[in-house]
Every structure is written in structure tokens, then in C-alpha cells.
Regions:
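Short glycine-rich His-centered loop
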Residues: 1-9
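Short, solvent-exposed turn/loop segments enriched in Gly/Ser/Thr/Pro and often Arg
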Residues: 37-39
Length: 200
């Protein structure tokens, strides 16, 4: 999803839309959104690129989407858990704030038996590592279950990736969550770390 699969153009991808949303919210700040997503990669493959593709840019904030490809390929949840914690610790050691992004609510993902366990694992890792979590699965499930949108409204024809509308909404929600977190007093954020694990 980060790489832009499902979008009609690069400008409609989630990172591109996020850059637009953040610049609207922070007009007096220089903001750069770097897209380092590669389609199809799993957690360990992303971590192999951390040094060259992530740490070399000295990011202040890393939005890390994890879990989907591992679930689709029936990978070991135990191995994924260890990799996830290691990856978070590496990003934190590099001085970056971290937001985890869990899998999408889409037919191809929902069909896998271990999706719920993966969602729970990522949420627990965020809590244990005291990093933020954007609950994409819950947001998209709300669109379907509560707002009664059809999958075709926010998922591309491949039944996996989001479409332009879905990416635009995701970017808007993420930008709003980042803006809210940035406005928190430091003392308040430190006193209530659990609040940082429920974005949006």
C-alpha cells in the first residue's frame, strides 16, 4: 500500500496525499514525506533496507506498515513478532518516533485465518514498545460495518489494496492524528503513554 499499489497515479498514493495533508496543517513548517515502500516485502526484507533507505535520511518520524504480506503468505507469527520488536528498537535507537500501521480490512486479508492474531500482535507490540499505532484495520472495518460502504468504495479491484478514495481518507486521518500528537504537551504525553497507542 505504501508503494502505491491500487492508486490510479503516484499523486493519488497514500504518501503523496499525506504530504499534501500535512503541509495544509503545518503551512509554516518544511515537511518532507519520503516513500520507502516496496510492494510485496515482509518485515525482515524491510529491515534489511533500514540502514540505506531509512536511517540514512535521519527521519524524525517513521510510519511503518507491517503484517499484511506475512499474513497473506502464512508466515510464522512467532518469527514475525521477534522481527517486529527488533525493527521497532532499531528505529527508536536511530532517534525516530515510530507509528505502526496494521493490515487493511480487505477481502484478501480477511480471508486469512491468522489476520486477527496479527492485528493483536501489532497492537501489543506498540503498547510494549511505547510507540504509536494507526489502527487501519479498525478504521476500514468501520467504513464497511458501520458506515455501510461497499468494498468497491475503498478497495481496488484486486481485493487487497486500497483505491484512491481509501488512500485519500487514510492520509487525512493519519495527518490529523499526527497533528493531534504534535500538539500534545510533552509532560502530558509522558504521563499518559497509553494514549499514544490509539491512532486515530
Amino acid at each position: 500500500s505504501t508503494a502505491g499499489a491500487g492508486a490510479s497515479s503516484p499523486a493519488a498514493s497514500y504518501p503523496a496525499r499525506l504530504a499534501v495533508e500535512l503541509k495544509q496543517r503545518f503551512p509554516n513548517h518544511a515537511i518532507a514525506v519520503l516513500n520507502r515502500g516496496v510492494n510485496g516485502e515482509e518485515t525482515d526484507q524491510m529491515m534489511d533496507r533500514f540502514s540505506a533507505d531509512v536511517m540514512a535520511a535521519h527521519p524524525q518520524l517513521v510510519l511503518w506498515q507491517v503484517g499484511t504480506n506475512s499474513v497473506l503468505r502464512d508466515r510464522s507469527l512467532e518469527i514475525h513478532e521477534a522481527q517486529l520488536h527488533q525493527g521497532i528498537e532499531e528505529l527508536k535507537a536511530a532517534g525516530a518516533d515510530v507509528v505502526l500501521i496494521d493490515p487493511q480490512f480487505a477481502p484478501a486479508v480477511n480471508a486469512k485465518a491468522e489476520t486477527a492474531d496479527m492485528i493483536q500482535q501489532i497492537a501489543l507490540a506498540a503498547k510494549q514498545e511505547n510507540v504509536d499505532l494507526f489502527r487501519r484495520f479498525a478504521v476500514m472495518r468501520n467504513w464497511y460495518d458501520v458506515q455501510h460502504l461497499a468494498f468497491a468504495d475503498f478497495v481496488s479491484p484486486d481485493q487487497l489494496h486500497m483505491n484512491d478514495w481509501g488512500y485519500a481518507c487514510w492520509a487525512k486521518l493519519m495527518a490529523g492524528a499526527i497533528a493531534e500528537a504534535a500538539s500534545r504537551p510533552i509532560a502530558s504525553a509522558a504521563a499518559h503513554p497509553a494514549h499514544a497507542t490509539n491512532l486515530p
